[in-house]
Regions:
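Conserved alpha/beta-domain cores
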Residues: 1-211
């Protein structure tokens, strides 16, 4: 409901204009409580003998530990997360199209453009896009309304850029995610490179400017 309300506000504010909505991109652990803080709470509750709510916190802690990745940027996120846990993105797409349908019924012109992030191969779109399009059709059928919409892809992995002609068979539009694309092309970490070596590289003429 909260996401649907947010999308409703977006469509209303952008009446008549396309609204590009990127589906969930960050890894799941970014939406979870801080692991160290949660561990402190669990230990404190155990020491004090507090049992109410302890099991839930322990289960959450186990789940967070299970989501740990050595390199989250290149791990389970974007379209990969949508394929492994499709119920998350299906819920998000349903919220988008229910909000769009409700706005249409109120006379607002909506043009949702749903963007699938971190696509690396057209096979990923072949798997996820038909499922999302079925949700769009189902919502419009339930609401007895029709409106324009598109499904597109973010190009932020070098392989996606190289195989863009194949990706374009499914994607109705592209958006270039230049931050991730630059990091993966150069093999640089945006967070670390500037601090550790980019200044030296520019001083030594290896790079004329930061990528």
């Amino acid at each position: 409901p909260s996401q649907r309300k947010d999308f409703d506000g977006l469509f209303e504010a952008m009446n008549g204009y396309p609204v590009i909505i990127r589906l969930i991109d960050p890894p799941l652990h970014e939406f979870m409580p801080d692991e160290e803080k949660l561990l402190e709470e669990v230990v404190t509750m155990r020491v004090k003998g507090e049992t109410e709510g302890l099991k839930a916190k322990e289960d959450l802690l186990v789940a967070i530990k299970g989501m740990h990745e050595s390199n989250p940027m290149m791990g389970l996120r974007g379209v990969r997360l949508s394929i492994v846990m499709p119920e998350i993105v299906e819920m998000q797409v349903r919220a988008i199209f229910e909000a769009a349908a409700d706005c249409t019924l109120r006379g607002i012109v909506v043009k949702p453009e749903v963007m699938i992030p971190l696509t690396g191969t057209v096979k990923e779109l072949d798997w996820i896009q038909p499922r999302l399009e079925r949700i769009a059709s189902a919502v419009m059928g339930e609401k007895k309304i029709k409106f324009e919409y598109k499904f597109g892809s973010m190009i932020e992995i070098p392989r996606a850029a190289i195989t863009a002609a194949d990706v374009a068979r499914d994607a109705e539009f592209f958006s270039f995610g230049t931050n991730d694309l630059t990091q993966m092309t150069y093999g640089y970490s945006r967070d670390d490179a500037a601090r550790n070596f980019l200044i030296t590289y520019q001083e030594q003429g290896i790079l004329l400017k930061t990528p």
